């Protein structure tokens, strides 16, 4: 896909990074930025001087690609506002880390109005907002596309082509499978990092080295967004938390029983799995 007019709605960290990356990947394309807050326009214009920026949903008219970069709770009203300005050939996607509920909400709205497919870039930072956006955020990062049985092959192909143009590694799975796996690989780590920070408290912070900092970095993420994500995906998150409790219990039991062999096996099993990530 070589889009000529790309609109990003609500450009924060992810949406802003899409805009910066797309400017480089598609130098001939017109970049459109929609923001609900007029006070954010100067910063957007400073970073993307050639972009068209405004607060009116009509900005998206004529776009062949539209990226919804708002939080999950804002997606439905945002989608409803842009519907009159879409064309049947327009490719519309999002960047939400939840897919089941988003698919159920948005797919019916876009039916016959545009070509819809869900996207989730597995890239980000504990720092939110457009100021943290980077043109290279998606380089070698996984982006998950969540087609359904009604998704056309052209829609999947065009979405895949777009994200690959930004440097991403594209994976496909169903919205349900996405939510299950992301609960394990993204949502659980945020819960664990939060629990670790709360358990350690502040007394030992002067001793914190790279291990603690690396392990807890994501706990500094925006609480409002993460509470929304965890509650939206609560079924899969709760299942994963229970599995994690089982792993903690297994580890604690080996330590309590002074079972060096079992403890070593647990640590080696985890180390082997983690090392496989380095080679993938």
Stretches with model-predicted labels:
Residues 1-57, 61:
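NAD(P)+-binding Rossmann beta1-loop-alpha1 motif at the extreme N-terminus of oxidoreductases
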Residues 5, 30, 115, 142, ...:
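Residues at the starts of beta-strands that form the adenosine-phosphate
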Residues 69-71, 96, 147, 195:
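Glycine-rich, N-terminal phosphate-binding loop of Rossmann-like dinucleotide-binding domains
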Residues 78-131:
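Rossmann-like NAD(P)(H) cofactor-binding subdomain of soluble oxidoreductases
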Residues 135-218:
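Internal alpha-helical scaffold of NAD(P)-dependent oxidoreductase catalytic cores
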